[in-house]
Amino acid sequence: MAKKSPRESSAQAGKICVYIVAHADDWQLFMQPNVYFDMVSPRSKVILIITTAGDAGKADNYWMAREEGAKSSVRYCLAHQSPLTVSNGKRKFFNNSIEYWSCNQVTIYFLRLPDGNLDGTGFASSNFQSLYRLKRSQSSTVSAIDHSATYDWLKFISVIDSITGYESTGIVNRWIHYLNPDPLINPNDHSDHVMTGLAVQKITSINSFQQLVYTGYAVSSHPATLSSTDLFWKAGMFAVYEKAVHDLCGYSTLAENVDLYVKWCCTGPKIEMVPASSDV
């Protein structure tokens, strides 16, 4: 049987949920339980766009392991429901070749831009390229760390816009999720989180989506509010991510700061909602 294209699948989906994040573990840590509920909803189509490799200046096996960790989180959510149908490949958007991976109704796109570091200064391994420098015109372009594509700021926005439009064709009930770039609401967040959020807000179709805008690192200061069931799925999704990363490259994410990751895992999301425009 021929596999359905995204456009054919869209006709069967009653809702599209697009999650756009900078790093492979952002959606597990800061957007739960929303991602889980959307993934297991039978008529929801879930698209994850991960804008950077999250390489932190390390060797290639680290960012590759992070991608595998994200895939493990998806499989963990879906495997109890039905057999898994997995595919992968590349799609072109604005002549940029973008890697994708699909599992049932969930698709992840990996743009693999270089990690910009917490403050946007980047890392020596990628010649200090970053989305922060790109947005501030401190550099004219930034290249994916696998050399698959080169972007200026407008092209970065356009590629996100093109992926979102391609996947949402024919679906009226549209939701888009991203980390809040407003430092007054979401202070002291990673530069890649902020730049990705700013880009999402500039896509041409943004007003046709219901927007859910999340707090990132600062959510650790909020009280733990997850139910036992929601905590089970959130902690489990991060645990399988962490295991995949460690198994594949020997790096322990938890070793960075165990107490902080516990807070992130035990805390529910802090969300601002922006409704879709009635004029669209």
Place the predicted regions along the sequence by residue.
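Terminal low-complexity/disordered tails
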Residues: 225-280
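Short, catalytically relevant binding-site loops at active-site mouths
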Residues: 115-116, 182-184, 219-220
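Short, conserved beta-strand edge motifs with alternating hydrophobic and charged residues
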Residues: 111, 175-180, 213-215
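Active-site adenylate/phosphate-handling loop in enzymes that bind or generate adenylated species
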Residues: 156-202
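Histidine-centered active-site/metal-ligand motif
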Residues: 23, 190-193, 280
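Active-site rim/loop-helix segments in enzyme catalytic domains that contact anionic ligands
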Residues: 3-168, 201-202, 235-243, 254, ...
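A generic structural signal for short coil/turn motifs at secondary-structure boundaries
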Residues: 56-60, 184-188, 222-225
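Extended hydrophobic/aromatic segments used for targeting, binding, or gating
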Residues: 189, 194-246
